[in-house]
């Protein structure tokens, strides 16, 4: 085993990463730097400092990355109306590039020669983290404990923790019956009962959203203001990116919006069932498509729709830092130059309904041409005859010459 001098660990303070921290110290006899990111997971992160200190850690990094996460990752992704396999809003996928970037930066800052993460050898996160590491620092050493050790179950982790004197709160021991991941964009649930895709998830599982059946009987209207494809104000109040998403999560959760139960194709080859709550993101997606509907040129909109699945797959599979994702981002961002205006949506029992959209500066909707009433000569209907004949020409020729 090659000697490791110092490793930067993505550290939550929970069971898995606490065991990893001790395992790194014992197995590699190396100094460990802990990095804990607040990306809106909704848990107190300062206890991670106390936990790291118990392990004798001298260099501890705890950072509030919520604004950077939404501004530089979530918002750029939503400019593309990004959805993986028709449903998934990529809440887990989009958080990994930022964490990987900060780990590499901290490694460079502290002189560490390795980075480590707590992703298992079965999932997508190991790929997402490590593609990011290598893209940002090609010679970095990566330590993935789940691919090395023999602690293959939660019970074995708990036994190791007890043997090594690793403090784990009883509530952590009992935990949730599901494997969960949360950030400001979503919360996900996997494992246990969900491993049978035919079984409905229990109502008690959902944490962010009320059941649509129990949601308020009165709808709620929201006005969202856009500049260059990003939301800058909600109901007339200017808000930062993280504040926008936080507020939309609260409002969407109140009305039972954003629940999703799906089976997805993982990059590593298997199918996996997951349940997700993305209330704010669901509202953002619907509203963004609405403002684009009146501000984007038709062919630009269609080209974006054609490219979106490829862009979504790049993010899902961990290629955020790849040249092809960056190239697509330039195109996407350029398309948003005129995506300015307002959208009104109605929230009601799990539904997001667009009820209005307007752009005083950039709308391409011309009512004098689109009207069903007298248009005063703005549109000459007779012009359509030649347009139709030219578009039918190839089909007319084929039918005339082939006769079968």
UniProtKB/Swiss-Prot annotation:
List the signal peptide residues.
none
- Which one of the record's GO molecular function terms can you name? ATP binding
> Which superkingdom is the protein from?
Bacteria
**Name the UniProt record assigns to this protein:** Argininosuccinate synthase
Q: Name the gene behind this protein.
A: argG
PROSITE patterns in the cross-refs: ARGININOSUCCIN_SYN_1, ARGININOSUCCIN_SYN_2
Give the binding site residues for L-aspartate: 120, 124-125
Swiss-Prot/TrEMBL catalytic activity: L-citrulline + L-aspartate + ATP = 2-(N(omega)-L-arginino)succinate + AMP + diphosphate + H(+)
């Amino acid at each position: 085993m090659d000697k490791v001098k110092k490793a930067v660990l993505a550290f939550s303070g929970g069971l898995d990463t606490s065991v990893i921290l001790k395992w790194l110290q014992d197995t590699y006899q190396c100094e460990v730097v802990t990095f804990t990111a607040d990306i809106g997971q909704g848990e107190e992160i300062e206890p991670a400092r106390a936990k790291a200190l118990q392990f004798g850690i001298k260099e501890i990094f705890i950072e509030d990355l919520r604004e950077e996460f939404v501004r530089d990752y979530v918002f750029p992704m939503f400019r593309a109306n990004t959805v993986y396999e028709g449903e998934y809003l990529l809440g887990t996928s989009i958080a990994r590039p930022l964490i990987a970037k900060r780990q590499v930066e901290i490694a460079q800052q502290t002189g560490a020669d390795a980075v480590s993460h707590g992703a298992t050898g079965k999932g997508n996160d190991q790929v997402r983290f490590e593609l990011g590491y290598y893209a940002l620092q090609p010679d970095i050493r990566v330590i993935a404990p789940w691919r090395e050790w023999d602690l293959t179950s939660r019970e074995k982790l708990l036994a190791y923790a007890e043997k090594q004197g690793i403090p784990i709160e009883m509530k952590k021991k009992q935990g949730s019956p599901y494997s969960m991941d949360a950030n400001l964009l979503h919360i996900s649930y996997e494992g246990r009962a969900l491993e049978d895709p035919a079984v409905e998830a229990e109502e008690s599982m959902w944490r962010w959203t009320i059941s649509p059946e129990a949601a308020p009987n009165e709808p709620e209207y929201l006005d969202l203001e856009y500049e260059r494809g990003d939301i800058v104000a909600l109901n007339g109040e200017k808000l930062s990116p993280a504040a926008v998403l936080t507020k939309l999560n609260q409002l969407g959760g109140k009305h039972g919006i954003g629940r999703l139960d799906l089976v997805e194709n993982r990059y590593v080859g298997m199918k996996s069932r997951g349940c997700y709550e993305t209330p704010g993101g669901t509202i953002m997606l619907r509203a963004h498509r609405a403002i684009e509907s009146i501000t984007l040129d038709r062919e630009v909109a269609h080209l974006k729709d054609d490219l979106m699945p490829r862009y979504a797959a790049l993010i899902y599979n961990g290629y955020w830092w790849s040249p092809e994702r960056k190239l697509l981002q330039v195109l996407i961002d350029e398309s948003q130059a005129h995506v300015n205006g307002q959208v009104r949506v109605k929230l009601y029992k799990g539904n997001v309904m667009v009820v209005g959209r307007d752009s005083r500066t950039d709308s391409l909707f011309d009512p004098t041409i689109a009207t069903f009433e007298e248009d005063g000569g703005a549109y000459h209907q007779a012009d359509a005859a030649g347009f139709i004949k030219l578009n039918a020409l190839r089909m007319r020729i084929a039918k005339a010459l082939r006769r079968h």
